């Protein structure tokens, strides 16, 4: 299941990236997938609970370090974008993003997050975006359905505006999922050897 998540996340980001960026993002995806496959194979050969505990400790350190990186990373926002020969400012695009996010129906416990995200996009001093806000924006837009030529055009403008961010976002997302895959491999191997250990202890 996680493998499919990695592949679909990469394919979505890469398919939206400019052609000059696609090869770099795709190469990284292939390298990380190979790395994860090799790691899974290595973990599957381990029968020691202590060794798995050591690996998990190392993996959690890698996870914490990467979470710290994602917390600090910033993606510069373009001042404008061009679609069908017409220029649209960051403010124009932000208005379209806010419009689409505002169409999403949510229960009250999620409203504050949506409200704060829209406030962020509305800010005139908003010139760079962190990973969490970008990830939330893209995931929320992915939930939307678009009706009519006007909305279709507007989401295409938003996508065009986001293109300069896609490669780095794809790399950051892919690395994040790869770390989760490795940790998942450790958990699955532990689940396999613990019943065996319990039987031998009886």
What is each PLM-predicted segment?
Residues 2-202:
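Positively charged, low-complexity terminal tracts
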């Amino acid at each position: 299941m996680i493998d499919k998540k990695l592949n679909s996340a990469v394919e979505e980001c890469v398919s939206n990236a400019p052609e000059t960026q696609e090869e770099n993002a795709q190469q990284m995806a292939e390298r990380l997938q190979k790395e994860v496959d090799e790691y899974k194979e290595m973990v599957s050969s381990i029968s020691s609970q202590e060794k798995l505990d050591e690996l998990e400790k190392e993996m959690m350190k890698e996870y914490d370090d990467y979470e710290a990186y994602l917390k600090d990373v910033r993606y510069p926002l373009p001042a404008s974008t061009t679609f069908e020969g017409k220029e649209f400012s960051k403010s124009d695009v932000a208005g379209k993003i806010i419009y689409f996010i505002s169409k999403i129906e949510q229960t009250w416990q999620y409203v504050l997050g949506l409200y704060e995200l829209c406030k962020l996009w509305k800010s005139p001093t908003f010139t760079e975006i962190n990973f969490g806000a970008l990830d939330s924006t893209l995931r929320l837009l992915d939930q939307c359905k678009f009706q009519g030529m006007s909305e279709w055009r507007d989401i295409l403008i938003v996508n065009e505006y986001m293109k300069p961010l896609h490669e780095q976002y794809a790399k950051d997302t892919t690395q994040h999922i790869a770390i989760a895959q490795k940790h998942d491999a450790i958990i699955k191997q532990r689940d396999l050897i613990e019943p065996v250990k319990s039987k031998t202890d009886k």
